[in-house]
């Protein structure tokens, strides 16, 4: 907890966020999605759009949505940064939700995790399949001299020791370019 008066504007930042009332939603929980991604599409994210008028009436200026990208389980194990998790719906569903929120003057902020990805991330899957021959092997911190706890035939760095969260090599310009292209 902190007082708004304690916030100091950093040089070059927009002032709107310092005076905003934020509302945070973890869509995977809020929308009641299955814990594990079974690939079955559902239009659950539309539930957030149903709350747009209520949020506007509360005086909410911005909504923070925890990860909504295609993921293996909890959202922080991203498979695809360009696609809404099928358990939540489609990119078109998300666009509709944004329009409803914007009609109530509610901004949308996405929680994007760009430090690591899930084991289902397309480039990591390519490394699992092709090993040394994968053009994406340098996208991760990998050693072909060891083995992972998943018996991949190579060792890799997982975020904070969590090997379902594959750490990206952010020193690789191709990785950075890919991530910037996604945002």
Predicted feature descriptions by range:
Residues 4, 10-180:
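Acidic/aromatic-lined carbohydrate-recognition and catalytic surfaces
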């Amino acid at each position: 907890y902190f007082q708004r008066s304690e916030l100091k504007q950093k040089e070059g930042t927009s002032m709107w966020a310092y005076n905003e009332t934020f509302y945070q939603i973890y869509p995977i929980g809020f929308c009641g999605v299955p814990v594990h991604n079974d690939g079955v599409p559902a239009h659950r994210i539309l539930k957030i759009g149903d709350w747009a008028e209520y949020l506007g009436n509360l005086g909410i200026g911005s909504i923070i949505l925890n990860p909504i990208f295609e993921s293996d389980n909890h959202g922080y194990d991203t498979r695809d940064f360009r696609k809404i998790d099928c358990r939540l719906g489609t990119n078109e569903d998300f666009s509709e939700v944004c329009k409803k929120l914007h009609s109530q003057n509610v901004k949308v902020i996405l929680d994007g995790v760009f430090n690591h990805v899930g084991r289902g991330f397309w480039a990591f899957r390519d490394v699992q399949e092709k090993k040394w021959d994968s053009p994406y092997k340098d996208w991760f911190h990998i050693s072909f001299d060891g083995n992972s706890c998943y018996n991949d035939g190579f060792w890799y760095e997982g975020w904070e020791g969590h090997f379902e969260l594959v750490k990206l090599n952010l020193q690789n310009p191709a990785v950075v370019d890919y991530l910037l292209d996604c945002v």
